[in-house]
Amino acid sequence: MSAASTTVIVGAGFGGIAAARTLRALLPAPHRILVVDWRPEVSLGAGHTWVLTGRKRPEQVSQRLSTITRHGLEFRCAEVVGVDPERMVLEVAGDKVKADALVLSPGARLTMEPLPGAAGVAHQFYDLDAALRLGNALDEFKGGRVLMAVIAPPYKCPAAPHEAALLIHERLSRKPGPERFSLSFVTPEPQPMPVAGATVGAAVRELYEQRGITARFGGKPVRVHSPSSTPAGSPPSRAVAGELELGDGTREPFDLLIVIPAHTAPAFLRESGLLSGNGWVSVSRDTLATSFEGVWAIGDVTHIPLAGGGMLPKAGVFARAAGEGVAHGVAARILGAPPAGSTPARFDGKGGCYLETGKGEAAYVEGDFFAESAPSVILHAPARTALQGKEKFAKEWARWY
């Protein structure tokens, strides 16, 4: 390949920034690394529960992407509107950008559309601004029934909804008002964190039972009924009452509704030929290569099947490891051979995440998700050391930028 190549990385989240920083260390300066993201800044998803509980401010869990240029990277804040993976050409805000290697790490887009009536009523915390609005709504909450609901899997970080439920329960329990509240959780899934197995699911159920949180598994939300529903979709700034209709026709009343939005692949991929029938990009499990030469995909936009019928969780820890591995594959393509002195990294499906449980503690969930018969996953009992581990994880994330 030419002495001056261009690698384009779409998305600067966990996977994209890990790929960019690792690749920069593997390639000499004449080789360009261009990172494209429609956002001027990114936030740490694991920190959103800190924002909604008032523990941290939004600026403490976010990073401006313009700073990545100090690491020898180029950055363009623009929307990708199309991609031709066969020619490795991106359409970026009206421009055509040709790449010698292309890494797709655009993340997933969030939507309330599969749940009619949710607009203007349902809060969420997967967006940083939404997490802040939810925190304000919790501050002003006067009591009643809090209902959390998963619209549909898959979604980012399988532990996040359960962490949020536990921390919201703790926050409301400590608040001078409301005088009385209850918290319920509804999901179409058969148990908490299904990919982690029955033992982990039972442990999370026990955490709920200890706090009096009621959970309904196998219940699919189909419609929100509330006078405050708005077709335009203006996000709520306060608690709004109504009822959540489920697939079996029953209704769950609420005074504050919090949902986990549905996740979809970005629109620019729909006509690319990259999406499989399940709506995500299929990749080689260990190399993250797509079916197109010189094109890789990592993170939330991918679908990686597991033994037992599940899929690899959409989680930052996996995206980061995948990004590091992909960087070695890109470098080998650009240089014609693996970089001298480097050890090629292959994605092994091992990793873990933190599940804050309140009282200054967190549980740590870790596993080998590529185990032959089924993922092998363990949930360690809540401890203060695990929460310290999450805080360290957040600091390490910030250093990537």
Q: What is the meaning of each model-derived region?
A:
Residues 2-8, 73-176, 258:
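FAD-binding core/adjacent interface of flavoenzyme oxidoreductases
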Residues 170, 317-347:
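Internal hydrophobic alpha-helix adjacent to the cofactor/substrate pocket in enzyme cavities
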Residues 2-73, 152-198:
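Beta1-alpha1 glycine-rich phosphate/pyrophosphate-binding loop at the start
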Residues 361-401:
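C-terminal auxiliary extensions adjacent to catalytic cores
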Residues 94, 106-107, 248, 261-262, ...:
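Glycine-rich, N-terminal phosphate-binding loop of Rossmann-like dinucleotide-binding domains
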Residues 118-142, 235, 251-321, 332:
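FAD-site-proximal beta/loop scaffold in flavoenzymes
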Residues 155-172, 312-322, 352-363:
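Short, electropositive alpha-helical surface patch
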Residues 32-34, 71-83, 97, 169-282, ...:
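A Rossmann-like FAD-binding core segment of flavoenzymes
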